[in-house]
């Protein structure tokens, strides 16, 4: 049996809690509401994943047709660091559907501690040794300072760049002269910081 992801663990624990409290499992709509999913369909996808991992059984034709099979799932911290792949617009970067896999890397080997890995796409940061295909170790925080290499989301596009702020303007600088800075006007554009880069794992040696 495959271990559960952190998000699957949340769904599993909610199902267990509802059964213990009310004697009945939750509906898809209740799961979506409790865990902040956009729709009951999103909850259904997580239930299907749990069923594939034999943590639950889905009983067709019943809104509360969920039966617990697994009593002691593997804890998510035993999985290692999650590797984030493509990030969908509007979804949290650590949403379960963005997790490609997990890597057995000790988060404490990075300072500050890494929370996830992000697969690097492109050569915009190659001058500081962040290469296409590398796994970037990221500490999840919004407490950032000018000059730090950050993982930023600009209007739902995720990028790795060096941060500079000037009033209402933010400049995201590449470490490659072939790439111009990304300019973000905070009065009209949305910018969110997902974390800071704390290390790199070279894909050719790790994968």
UniProtKB/Swiss-Prot annotation:
Site residues (Cleavage), renumbered to this chain: 89-90
What highest taxon heads this organism's lineage? Answer: Bacteria
What are the positions of the active site? Answer: 124, 161
Instruction: Indicate the transmembrane segments per the record.
Output: none
Q: Which Pfam families match?
A: LexA_DNA_bind, Peptidase_S24
| Enzyme Commission number(s) | 3.4.21.88
Q: Which reaction equations make up its catalytic activity? A: Hydrolysis of Ala-|-Gly bond in repressor LexA
**Gene3D superfamilies recorded for this chain?**
Umud Fragment, subunit A, Winged helix-like DNA-binding domain superfamily/Winged helix DNA-binding domain
Complex formation: Homodimer.
Function in brief: Represses a number of genes involved in the response to DNA damage (SOS response), including recA and lexA. In the presence of single-stranded DNA, RecA interacts with LexA causing an autocatalytic cleavage which disrupts the DNA-binding part of LexA, leading to derepression of the SOS regulon and eventually DNA repair.
- Which NCBIfam families would you find in this protein's record? lexA
Family in the record = Belongs to the peptidase S24 family.
Recorded protein name is LexA repressor
| The encoding gene | lexA
């Amino acid at each position: 049996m495959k271990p559960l992801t952190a998000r699957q663990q949340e769904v599993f624990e909610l199902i267990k809690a509802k059964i213990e409290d009310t004697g009945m499992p939750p509906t898809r709509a209740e799961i979506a509401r409790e865990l902040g999913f956009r729709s009951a369909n999103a909850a259904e996808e997580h239930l299907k994943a749990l069923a594939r991992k034999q943590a639950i059984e889905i009983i067709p034709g019943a809104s509360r047709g969920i039966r617990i099979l697994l009593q002691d799932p593997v804890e998510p911290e035993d999985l290692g660091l999650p590797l984030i792949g493509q990030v969908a617009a509007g979804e949290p970067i650590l949403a379960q559907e963005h997790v490609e896999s997990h890597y057995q890397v000790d988060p404490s080997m990075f300072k500050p501690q890494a929370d996830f890995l992000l697969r690097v796409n492109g050569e915009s940061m190659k001058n500081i040794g962040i290469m296409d295909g590398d796994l970037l170790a990221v500490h999840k925080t919004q407490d950032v300072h000018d000059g730090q290499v950050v993982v930023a989301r600009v209007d739902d596009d995720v990028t790795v760049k060096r941060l500079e702020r000037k009033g209402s303007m933010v400049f995201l600088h590449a470490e490659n002269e072939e790439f111009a800075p990304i300019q973000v006007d905070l009065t009209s554009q949305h910018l969110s910081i997902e974390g800071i880069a704390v290390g790199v794992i070279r894909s050719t040696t790790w994968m």
